[in-house]
């Protein structure tokens, strides 16, 4: 009878120590984030992806985090897109007290290199880099696609908009 109690105690101790190791590993992951996004050429100058958009290989983006209180830059990191127009970067540390956003830096296509300066578009690239935000997937953050624009919209844009059932406030 005593040997069964010792065996049960030993098995319980092994199981509990295994769970403690998993909890520690998960706690370490809370301050490590994988950021994923993409960069495209906005051939219609509408700031959303259409069937005419082209994803850009070799585009540079920058992650910048600033203090909420004084605006001091606390983190800067750059990434370059692959052949599918996608980029990935890993960030460590909890940035709950900071405003973090991804911005376009450089386009590989000189014919598609305009960046909108509209304030509402900068909000589209903001990202939460804290585990204390209610997001279930605490490790991966997916950013809205960012787009460089051409100087003059493509002549095919009105047809693409008609297919979508929209008529944007754009002069062609």
From Swiss-Prot:
Q: What stretches pass through the bilayer?
A: none
Question: What is the official name of this protein in its record?
Answer: Pollen-specific protein-like At4g18596
The organism's superkingdom is given as Eukaryota
* Glycosylated residues in this chain: 70
PROSITE patterns for the chain: OLEEI
Residue runs in coiled coils: none
In the UniProt record, the signal sequence range is: 1-27
Recorded hits in Pfam families, A to Z, give: Pollen_Ole_e_1
Q: State if Nucleotidyltransferase is listed as a keyword.
A: no
Q: Where in the cell is it found?
A: Secreted
Q: Which cysteines are joined by disulfide bonds?
A: 41-112, 44-157, 65-100
GO CC terms in record = extracellular space
Q: What is its main location?
A: secreted
Q: Which family does it belong to?
A: Belongs to the Ole e I family.
Q: Does the keyword Secreted apply?
A: yes
Q: Which UniProt keywords apply?
A: Disulfide bond, Glycoprotein, Secreted, Signal
Tell me which species this is from: Arabidopsis thaliana
């Amino acid at each position: 009878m005593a040997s069964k109690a010792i065996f049960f105690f030993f098995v319980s101790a092994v199981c509990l120590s295994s769970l403690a190791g998993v909890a520690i590993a998960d706690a370490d992951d809370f301050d490590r984030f994988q950021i994923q996004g993409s960069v495209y050429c906005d051939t219609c100058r509408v700031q959303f992806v259409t069937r005419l958009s082209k994803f850009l290989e070799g585009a540079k983006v920058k992650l910048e985090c600033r203090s909420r209180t004084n605006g001091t830059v606390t983190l800067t990191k750059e990434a370059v897109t692959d052949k599918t127009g996608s980029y990935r970067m890993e960030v460590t540390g909890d940035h709950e007290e900071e405003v973090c956003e991804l911005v376009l830096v450089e386009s590989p296509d000189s014919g598609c290199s305009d960046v909108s300066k509209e304030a509402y578009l900068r909000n589209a690239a903001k990202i939460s880099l804290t585990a204390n935000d209610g997001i279930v997937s605490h490790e991966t953050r997916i950013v809205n696609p960012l787009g460089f624009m051409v100087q003059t919209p493509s002549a095919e844009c009105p047809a693409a908009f008609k297919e979508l059932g929209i008529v944007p406030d754009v002069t062609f």
